[in-house]
Amino acid sequence: MAKKFIKGTELVQAGFANGISTQLAAKGEFGSLTTKEKQEIIDNAAAAYARFLEALGCDWQNDPNSEDTPMRVAKAYVNDLWAGRFEPLSGITAFPSDGYDGIVQESNIPVTSMCSHHHQTIGGRVSIAYVPSKDGKVVGLSKLNRIVEHFGRRGAIQEQLTVAIHNAVDKICEGNIGVAVMIDATHNCVSCRGVKHHGASMQTAKLSGCFLNEEAARAEFYKNIELAGVCRH
């Protein structure tokens, strides 16, 4: 299936935190970067990072532990840490719910991202739930993990990441009557700099439909999180 952007999930301007790269945006809705174009981005980023190290007084060229660091860092950003900036979300197939109209929830989904302010890592867990209508759509369970992985690998403002995951699930699971997303994550920009507080975590949630308007649905969502051992309420 051809890769494409899912309309309604891009919250910010291309190049901004939580957004796609300007290079990918130039390709249009159905575009992807070629291997050659990605390599050019890596080469340019490696050269820029080498200058960054030199500005900090790092003699990377003569240090055997650092001589390949600019290229390693550039590859890590493009192929891993920010991979979601350089590829659109793959087409995700939704299937008829076949009359099922109960809660569908996956908790304890790992998320790894990077703080957009100081480029320190973020790590945590995501819980996602939705309720399909009887004639609505459901997706394979691993697709929820894929959505988390895609948007997490962009560099994140956690609040926007929460909304992006919610919007993607909402768009893909057509005819749903509610979507809920919660992220519980620790930020190394808090533990490694500034206040240097270890163990502090941040919770963000985006609820819509029945999860926002009905106490019973909301309580079931948070109870399932508790049962999964993500956090205690």
Feature map (PLM): residue ranges:
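A domain-level signal for the structural core that forms small-molecule/cofactor-binding pockets
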Residues: 2-233
